[in-house]
Amino acid sequence: MTVMEHTKAASIDLTKHGLRNVKEVVRNPSYEMLFAEETRADLEGYEKGVVTELGAVAVDTGIFTGRSPKDKYIVKDATTEEHMWWTTPAVPNDNKPITQEVWNDLKQLVTNQLSGKRVFVIDGYCGANPDTRLSIRVITEVAWQAHFVKNMFIRPTEEELASFEPDFVVMNGAKCTNQKWKEHGLNSENFTVFNLTERMQLIGGTWYGGEMKKGMFAMMNYFLPLKGIASMHCSANMGKEGDVAIFFGLSGTGKTTLSTDPKRALIGDDEHGWDDDGVFNFEGGCYAKTIKLSKEAEPDIYNAIRRDALLENVTVRNDGSINFDDGSKTENTRVSYPIHHIENIVKPVSKGGHANKVIFLSADAFGVLPPVSKLTPEQTKYHFLSGFTAKLAGTERGITEPTPTFSACFGAAFLTLHPTKYAEVLVKRMEEAGAEAYLVNTGWNGSGKRISIQDTRGIIDAILDGSIEEAPTKHVPIFNLEVPTSLPGVDPTILDPRDTYVDPLQWESKAQDLAQRFINNFAKYTDNAEGQSLVAAGPQLD
């Protein structure tokens, strides 16, 4: 075996991970080498990258253009049995158990796939705080997957690599599938499986890069809260005075747009922890959606798409130009890039002090939630556990039916402990820091129109500069929320949602409908004392 070192670090032994007769190990290659490797003329199929006119390489991830939660499994053993939030028929989630025996078969499959090959090894960190980060090793035979990992995790220094020992190993065998899946009782021939005793993730059948990123997020979501550290699906930024704000929100609520603010430096756009020192990014890069991307609307992201960025599933024309409007392959077109491709970031390390503002973003398509409400600690836990947003289904003009989504902690797909654990740790951190929480509706109101981005930005500014604290408030019934009656730069007629309806009874009827959905959804958290105690903080129907 030869080890092609692109660092001064000592060579590595992959036999301890189960690999045999590896032809060559390419460890932590430079971006230049990855560019050459992923665009080689002899590559075929999903391995081959195409150079675009922006300088970034574009790849196709095959039939999987998003994560495959139905193919996610975790070994149930002495390590995980007690703390893991296992799926149940009553409250299904993505944490499905498998036995050690099934794991052994899948590990054999993946190690057979990677043995005897030339492999790329990327060593990096998940977590910007050295005390609590996970040292991650990813092994793959596909150059662009190594590139994705280099972009998304925190890149070690030469010195750190010299003594690098992985806490967690990801073996990506995208080219192999499990023909015994029925015998194993699995969902399909594809798999992404975790063993927390062996501290390893195995991937087979899917080429989608996000499985590696979100896999490690799920692991941080397991290990950190058990140490009293908040693990959060949120964006974070910092003001000129060092004040930190965090933004929770599901897809389409404005998390990236509102945290990318010329007046504030970005800490990170997706995954963060909060420990005794403050808020820190888990990642060394960003993974942004590119569907309908334009330079005018999102200049920061557009300008980040250059050499070293990696595009996924976009349409590249013969001349190398990109059609960002084309969603024929998937609406989930993406780009990964190292965080330093964004100009206004917190440097040299993506971390800040304790957050003093926590913002829950919800796009309410029912049109009944206030544009902004200040939350009590109990309401903070309630709305964090609810993780509500709603989309308008249908593309016709006129009336469409709102579809509610409740995703615990604004990221249920990535939770590995019971949701109440995350709420408990977050609120404890907030109380220690004296942080305030706000629920911000970036969706609709009684006018039938979406709340304008100008008004929403005005609301966010009022939260961040503290002027919302000086505003007079009033009580909005049913949702049991306190709302300001005026804010600088915000249309005062929208602040009480009842005022946006010609007939206030129409608001009441819709509000009761949504309140009942909140109540029905929250019932699943009342299986413990913590959840039961929060019911009074949510919507109330007489």
Swiss-Prot record:
Binding-site positions, Mn(2+): K214, H233, D270
From the record, what ranges are coiled-coil? none
EC primary class: lyase
| Entry note: cofactor | Binds 1 Mn(2+) ion per subunit.
Q: What is its EC number?
A: 4.1.1.49
- Quote the catalytic activity from the record: oxaloacetate + ATP = phosphoenolpyruvate + ADP + CO2
Alphabetically ordered keywords of this record: ATP-binding, Cytoplasm, Decarboxylase, Gluconeogenesis, Lyase, Manganese, Metal-binding, Nucleotide-binding
Q: Which cofactor does it need?
A: Mn(2+)
A single GO cellular-component term on record:
cytosol
Recorded metabolic or biological pathway in which this protein acts: Carbohydrate biosynthesis; gluconeogenesis
Cite the binding residues for ATP: 214, 233, 249-257, 298, 334, 450-451, 456
A Pfam family annotated for this chain is PEPCK_ATP
Mind listing the GO molecular function terms for this protein? ATP binding; metal ion binding; phosphoenolpyruvate carboxykinase (ATP) activity
Determine the domain of life of the protein's source: Bacteria
Where, per UniProt, does this protein localize? Cytoplasm
- Tell me the function of this protein: Involved in the gluconeogenesis. Catalyzes the conversion of oxaloacetate (OAA) to phosphoenolpyruvate (PEP) through direct phosphoryl transfer between the nucleoside triphosphate and OAA.
The record's PANTHER family line, in alphabetical order, gives: PHOSPHOENOLPYRUVATE CARBOXYKINASE (ATP), PHOSPHOENOLPYRUVATE CARBOXYKINASE ATP
Q: Indicate the family of this protein.
A: Belongs to the phosphoenolpyruvate carboxykinase (ATP) family.
Q: How does it assemble?
A: Monomer.
Name of the protein: Phosphoenolpyruvate carboxykinase (ATP)
Q: What is the lineage of its organism?
A: Bacteria, Pseudomonadati, Pseudomonadota, Gammaproteobacteria, Vibrionales
Gene name? pckA
